[in-house]
């Protein structure tokens, strides 16, 4: 496996976790009445989710085994 693919594989879980974290922070900000911050955090969650989708696509196309993130990605998608 190419070194860059190994590095990308290591980022998949990070991106999904970041998406979930930003989504959670967005909800907290919304509950606190900080709507502007909530929207920015939600945008950040969406960006991280898109990064995860792109990473998964690259790894799948390259035939690289990677952690099964379908459950967490579904949770992240639901939170968006």
Predicted features by range, described:
Residues 1-80:
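Non-heme di-metal
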């Amino acid at each position: 496996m190419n070194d860059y693919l190994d590095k990308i594989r290591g980022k998949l879980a990070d991106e999904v976790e970041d998406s979930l974290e930003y989504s959670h922070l967005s909800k907290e900000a919304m509950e606190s009445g900080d709507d502007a911050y909530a929207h920015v955090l939600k945008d950040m969650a969406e960006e991280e989710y898109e990064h995860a989708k792109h990473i998964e696509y690259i790894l799948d196309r390259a035939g690289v085994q990677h952690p099964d993130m379908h459950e967490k990605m579904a949770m992240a998608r639901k939170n968006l």
